[in-house]
Amino acid sequence: MTERKIRVAALQEKAMPRSSVQEKLGRTLELIETASKDGCQIIVAGELCTSDYDRFYGTKDVSLFPEAEPIPGPSTEAVGKLTKKYKNYVIFPMFEKAAPGIYYNAAATIGPDGTVVGNYRKTHVAGVQVLEKLYFRAGQDFKVWETAFEPRARFGTIICHDRRYPETSRILAMLGAEMMFCPTAAPGYAGGVHWGVVNIARAVDTGMFCIYSNRVGPEGNKKYFGESMIVNPHGEVIATGGDRENAVIAADCDLALVDEARIAVPTLRDIRNDFYMKYYSKPSYDALI
């Protein structure tokens, strides 16, 4: 049987507070090139990688909106030049302007032909501590893509806060994903068990590779801890970024482990969606409203 292995990378970008979109983009393009030269076939950058995420906390900052771009647009075109050169995929998270007055926390997937082949919009927009709901609409869809090259790997994307909802990763798995990419911008309070334990749990829940990127370093009054990681379907961390700045965290993923994990613990086979729905249809927990 032909081996099904694919090399992936998470970019751990150093925060660049109050620098321009172009300056941040330049940093990310350099890291994409480094990862591509290392043979990485799917690369994920950090959440809102061309924006200062600390500015989404507190009072609404209307000066952020001019930074938003359409998808496709100038930034995705710049990334596309590299994916076309190296014949790989890049998941590029950004502040998307979908239409006048309509914005999303998005992650464009740019393919080997240099074009945008997909776009995921964050479905669980944070509304506690960081006030994303003042800026972004919630996405309404999950999708899985298949690589145009062998081993025809199937992958999907969620964004940061989405990972706290097991349904997000499980839906991707049920749609056929073997890998989940999750760009984040997680500062100190999102560390500890809220980071490693949750990230590992999503891999174990679904029996797939989970790749998490995070920024690192100070930005305004926030400090991002890095610790980007790649977790295999058995819940083993196979690569981590620690607190390194502008680092490429890469690993070779043997996709045979996906079936191995799902056969050993067949949660996807035994899931009872019809049973759960009678509870999901009831009012949500509202003690904090």
Residue ranges and their predicted role:
Residues T2-K14:
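Short beta-strand segments enriched in small/hydrophobic residues
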Residues A68-E69, K81, A98-M179, P187-A201, ...:
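Active-site catalytic loop in hydrolytic enzyme cores
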Residues F92-M94, A106-T109, K143, S228-I230, ...:
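Short beta-strand scaffold segments in enzyme catalytic cores
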Residues M1-K5, G26, L288-I289:
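Basic/polar N-terminal segments that are highly enriched at the extreme N-terminus
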Residues R18-P112, N119, A186-T206:
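Cys-nucleophile CN-hydrolase/nitrilase-fold catalytic domain and related Cys-dependent amidase chemistry
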Residues I71-I91, R154, C160-I249:
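CN hydrolase (nitrilase-like) catalytic-core segments centered on the catalytic cysteine
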Residues S51, R55, A108, Y120-A126, ...:
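Short beta->alpha transition motifs characteristic of CBS
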Residues A256-I289:
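A short C-terminal boundary segment appended to hydrolase-like catalytic domains
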